[in-house]
From Swiss-Prot:
Keywords: Cytoplasm, Heme, Iron, Kinase, Metal-binding, Phosphoprotein, Repeat, Transferase, Two-component regulatory system
Gene Ontology process terms (BP): phosphorelay signal transduction system
Keyword Iron set for record: yes
CDD domains, alphabetized: PAS
Purpose of the protein: Heme-binding sensor kinase component part of a two-component regulatory system involved in methyl sulfide metabolism. Does not act as a phytochrome-like photoreceptor.
Record-given protein name: Methyl sulfide methyltransferase-associated sensor
The encoding gene: msmS
Domain Histidine kinase: residue ranges: 783-998
Source taxon at top rank: Archaea
Xref: PANTHER family: PAC DOMAIN-CONTAINING PROTEIN (PTHR43304:SF1), PHYTOCHROME-LIKE PROTEIN CPH1 (PTHR43304)
Length: 998
């Protein structure tokens, strides 16, 4: 039996008929072929490998008729949606016969018992020669709804065909074939292998692209002229590659341009013809228009992309613009738009119109929804498709005709966009720059895009509504000033928190939700929170205090109001936690204020204490009130160049083990702690160990500083002391600055008061001694006069002469002058103490009114007339009679200039000169009082207007300067918003300047 089979196989493989077993798929791929295929120049491998299908060797001019007859036979769309030829049975039924399909599309005996048929057509051998064959086709297998495998038995009838056919018959056959080719959908080309691929032959159905065969065969157009510019390089590369690899056949897809400029997709299948030398003679191929398939693929792709953007939550504007852009890419030359319906206004507004001329879109935007209101308005109003092939003639376009003409719009097609419930959402509109109506596939294109736009609009609107609702809730949730926490009653972590929690704690929301609740709640509150959670579950609500730990470790005190709520279908505890940091600070501040007031009261009551007791008390209270571990106090010299360390706090002295402690610190060489003097303001350093270019380092065994605060203590504008504290557990802040400043200013005022009282006692004692001395001299004079009046009581030689009496008078005058000097000093001290007391009590009042300054100056000179006369001073005044009035307190101004003139007289020698000059300047009156005294050292000038100033560096020595009243003078000028300054050079006299606003 095996031998018989082998003989049979040998007979078949060597017989005259070549047998193919083909699959009913695109290109008719070959499952097997007999070995005698070598008759046609091929090998079985050429087909079985998939390199060639049976359809590839059919002569191009015969391919369509062979396909159509096959379709007619199997009575089914064999190619279906898989075959690139896109030629279906319905297109050929007129030629192939009016066969009807049965219900399942079966073949065979349902066709009347015939299970095979015969065709005659031409094949191409491998060298490109044409062979006439007779092919018997028999279906061997079937699948449900389509053919499976079929057998093709091919006989070479070329010789018989040539013998049988006479020339006329051959001509008739050729004409018939041409007719079939020219009337089919497959365009046949014959190209020369030259640059540009000139065309030797093209079928007449090239007219489907708008061209004539003569356009190509005449040489006016070469084939590369119609290939889309973006695809030309790829096509050239593909042809070159297949040519170099020695292939005889290849296929490719690309775009070509119709004569109108319209883009078409084609599938080209090409045979490469070579001569005996292997040189390429020509390219023979067919073009199949696959535009419809490509557009369907692109439409599906664009729909998927639009749907992806919808699903990703893109905005409606973005989705509609994407949809319109894809539509315009698929159909170049069409201007696509989407208009959205505003139900309240009953108008259409553009959602996307990227290519529509702005002049037209601006005019149509907001068009009313009604019949005869432009194409889109009519479509929305009627809910039906509106096709306008010629805008210039259609009644629907009367309102927009003129503008459309200006921008070159000639046709318009509008499709209503519906929701799933059938409501009109808008209109998908296409504008053209040519007058025509849409083709069938374009109508489907419009409908599909309108449907997709409806999905997008409805989805986005629904998503927007949901998002808006969620946003309203989230906005309220996140913008409540309190911290909001949601957790399950027995949950160990939080289900949700608001943005305030995120902002205040410094964690991301994800971090907070992944943390245990007790990682956020400080440990000191754990027991209290657990207890309150149990009470909330039992009672439903609870108010209690707790805290939250920030990412940086800071604890925020909270007042928690918690209750049971339903959240997302779950029973949860909703906690409204109010930050009570400010309240806690206020409580602390209140306690501090109480402590500060207590400290200031105690300080005020220490008038009888020693300087050491006062400074020690102030320093230790500064440490206590700021919560510090250490403190110090240093006094400044008169020139603000050197600090003298007065004392350290007890705690600092316990920690410090420096053997040779430094007490005198030049400001220039001081480190970071000297910035309070250099910058003349409080300096807070909450990270003292951090590198700082201003730090000079501290000695071995010095107290280690972590945090530091120091302040300058002012007397007027002059720094008189520096106080500092350090190593507070928390950061220093402005509250600490305020505590330290108030305490140290109180200390300094007490020191001043003690020094003034001491000066008062000293001057009082000196005045008493001067008074006793004066009384003693008076007694001596009385006794002497009595002896002169009663000479009998003494011998002549014992009587004193008048020279002795004159000496007694001189001594008496000296005592009187001394008494007057100390009396005047005492008066000024008392006046100054009184002014300081009134200033401290806030009882110095000013009464501002229009005042004649020349009258004030006249009164001031009158008050000093006796002093001027005693010194026989020459006075010169330059005051304009038309001097402007100023707004001031006449009494205070009189006191001001009386004191300044008194000061000038004091520094002017006997018989010297005193000058007054008053001049008006822009917005001010400038008064200058000059004397011819010896002048004052420049080093003392900056301190003349201080309440006190040092004459040496000892804090215990007396201060001078208040007696002069210049401090009071400056306060009066400041109250009038004026300026006062002093100019002097030793030996050249003094100039006192005052500027007062008009």
């Amino acid at each position: 039996m095996i031998g018989v089979d082998m003989k049979l196989e040998t007979l078949v493989n060597n017989g005259p008929a070549v047998i193919f077993l083909c699959r009913a798929e695109t290109g008719w791929p070959v499952e097997t072929v007999t070995a005698n295929i070598v008759r046609f120049g091929y090998s079985p491998k050429d087909f079985i490998s998939g390199g060639l299908g049976y359809a590839d060797i059919i002569y191009p001019a015969d391919l369509e008729i062979a396909v159509s007859q096959f379709f007619s036979y199997v009575e089914k769309d064999y190619i279906g949606k898989d075959l690139d030829y896109k030629v279906e049975y319905r297109e050929y039924k007129g030629e192939a016969g009016e066969h009807k399909r049965n219900g399942k599309g079966n073949i065979g005996k349902d066709r009347g018992g015939y299970d095979s048929f015969t065709q005659q057509y031409r094949l191409l051998n491998k060298s490109g020669d044409v062979l006439w064959v007779e092919a018997e086709i028999k279906v061997l297998e079937e699948e449900e709804g389509k053919a499976g495998l079929f057998q093709v038995t091919v006989f070479d009838i070329s010789r018989w065909k040539h013998t049988e056919k006479a020339m006329p018959a051959a001509l008739d056959t050729e004409n018939e074939l041409k007719r079939i080719i020219n009337s089919g959908h497959v365009i046949v080309f014959l190209w020369r292998a030259e640059p540009g691929w000139p065309v030797d032959f093209v079928s007449e159905n090239i007219s489907e692209l708008g061209y004539t065969p003569e356009d190509f065969t005449s040489g006016r157009i070469v084939y590369t002229d119609i290939i889309h510019p973006d695809d030309l390089d790829n096509v050239r590369a593909e042809v070159s590659k297949n040519t170099e690899e020695g292939r005889d056949y290849f296929s490719k897809e690309y775009r070509v341009l119709a004569k109108s400029g319209e883009v078409r997709y084609v599938d080209e299948r090409t045979l490469i013809r070579r001569n005996e030398k292997g040189e390429i003679t020509c390219y023979q191929g067919i073009l199949l228009d696959i535009t419809q398939r490509k557009e369907a693929e692109e439409l599906i792709l664009s729909q998927n992309r639009v749907l992806e953007r919808i699903a990703s939550g893109a905005s409606l504007d973005e989705v509609l613009l994407l949809l319109v852009n894809y539509a315009e890419e698929m159909k170049p030359g069409l201007l696509c738009t989407v208009m959205l319906l505003d139900r309240e206004q009953k108008r259409l507004f553009y959602g996307a119109c990227p290519s529509l001329p702005k002049l037209y879109s601006k005019a149509i935007n907001g068009i009313q929804v009604q019949v005869n209101s432009e194409t889109a308005g009519t479509a929305a109003g009627t809910g039906k498709r509106v096709i306008v092939g010629n805008i210039m003639k259609d009644p629907f376009c009367e309102e927009c005709r003129e503008i459309a003409q200006k921008v070159g719009l000639k046709a318009c097609w509008a499709e209503p966009i519906f929701s799933s419930g059938g409501e009109v959402l808008g209109v998908f509109t296409i504008y053209l720059r040519e007058t025509r109506k849409p083709r069938e596939e374009e109508l489907e294109f419009i409908r599909t895009n309108a449907y997709l736009a409806g999905i997008a609009i409805e989805h986005v609107q629904a998503a927007d509504a949901l998002k808006e609702s969620e946003n309203r809730f989230r906005t309220i949730f996140d913008n409540i000033n309190d911290q909001l926490y949601i957790r399950e009653p027995d949950g160990i972590s939080y289900m949700d928190v608001n943005q305030v929690v995120v902002d205040r704690l410094g964690y991301s929301k994800e971090e907070i939700l992944n943390m245990k609740a007790e990682e956020i709640i400080p440990s000191e509150y754990w027991a209290s929170v657990r207890e309150n959670m149990q009470k909330i579950k039992a009672e439903g609500s609870r108010i209690f205090e707790a805290g939250a730990v920030c990412k940086g470790g800071t604890v925020i005190p909270l007042e928690v109001s918690a209750r049971i709520i339903d959240y997302g279908g779950k029973k949860t505890i909703f906690s409204v936690s109010r930050d009570i940091t400010e309240r806690k600070k206020a409580e602390v501040a209140q306690r501090l204020n109480g402590s500060r007031l207590e400290a200031l009261v105690k300080l005020d009551q220490m008038a009888g204490a020693s300087l050491k007791e006062i400074t020690d008390f102030a320093r230790e209270e500064a440490v206590r009130l700021t919560g510090s571990k250490l403190g110090y106090l240093a006094f400044m010299d008169a020139y603000e160049s050197t600090l003298v360390m007065h004392s350290w706090s007890d705690s600092a002295m316990e920690e410090c083990s420096i053997e040779d402690k430094q007490f005198v610190y030049p400001v220039k060489s001081m480190g970071l702690w000297g910035e309070a003097v250099r910058q003349r303001k409080p300096i807070i350093t909450n990270d003292y160990p951090a590198p700082n270019p201003l730090k000079k380092g501290y000695p071995k065994n010095h107290v280690h500083l972590i945090r530091h605060l120091n302040i300058p203590v002012f007397d007027g504008k002059r720094i008189v002391a520096v106080a500092g504290v350090g190593n507070k557990e928390e950061n220093y802040d402005e509250s600490d600055v305020r505590q330290l400043t108030l305490l140290m200013q109180g200390m300094w005022q007490l020191i001043q008061r003690k020094q003034l009282e001491e000066a008062l006692r000293t001057y009082s004692g000196e005045l008493s001694r001067a008074n006793e001395e004066l009384r003693s001299v008076n007694m001596m004079k009385t006794e002497f006069v009595e002896e002169m009046m009663f000479p009998e009581k003494a011998e002549y030689g014992e009587i004193m002469d008048y020279e002795t009496l004159y000496a007694i008078d001189s001594q008496q005058q000296k005592a009187v002058n001394t008494f007057i000097h100390y009396s005047e000093k005492l008066r000024r001290l008392v006046d100054s103490l009184l002014y300081q007391s009134l200033e401290k009590a806030g009882k110095i009042d000013y009464s501002f009114e229009e005042t004649q300054l020349k009258d004030v100056l006249s009164d001031a000179f009158l008050n000093n007339v006796f002093l001027i006369g005693e010194k026989a001073l020459e006075v010169k005044k330059e005051v304009s009679a038309s001097l402007s009035e100023i707004k001031g307190d006449r009494e205070k101004l009189t006191a001001l200039f009386t004191a300044l003139i008194d000061h000038a007289i004091k520094f002017t020698p006997q018989g010297g000169k005193l000058a007054l000059e008053v001049k008006e300047e822009a917005g001010n009156v400038h008064i200058v009082i000059a004397d011819s005294g010896k002048g004052i050292s420049k080093e003392l000038i900056p301190y003349l207007f201080d309440r006190l100033y040092q004459v040496n560096d000892s804090i215990t020595r007396r201060y001078q300067g208040l007696e002069s009243g210049l401090y009071i003078c400056k306060n009066i000028v400041d109250a009038h918003k004026g300026e006062i300054w002093f100019e002097s050079e030793e030996g050249l006299g003094n100039l006192m300047h005052v500027k007062l606003p008009k």
